[in-house]
């Protein structure tokens, strides 16, 4: 029985050597799982993700003066409401939080920029004018939302020193 066991070792070593050496070329290439935007249909599909998924209305309302004064009886429904209504630093990272709004808007801007880049790569055909317009609109809207939530109100006196938001016009 012992002799039969040792007969299989050379075959196993040979099989392992062949298996491991045959993967060399496959592992040398970096996988690229990005979708190539090379047709009108793919660009149109990409624009579906150029809209923010986060609803910023609650955040805007809670940090504004558009609220009822209930005296000492007001209680927050969740941590997001408490932080927004009392102007505390935002630590809440769930749905509709400042954190998710920031990330979702920049994901949407990236999708719009990808569509615009694909349209430019295709030579700006007039058949893609509606998609180009939608991508520009989505990019502008997302920047508008971000600047209204995260930036100071414009002041000619302090506009050169006030911080704004990163304005993304190209793919990263």
Roles of regions detected by a PLM:
Residues 67-68, 131-138, 159, 168:
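Acidic helix-start/capping segments at beta-turn-to-alpha-helix junctions
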Residues 22-67:
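Membrane-proximal, proline-rich intrinsically disordered regions
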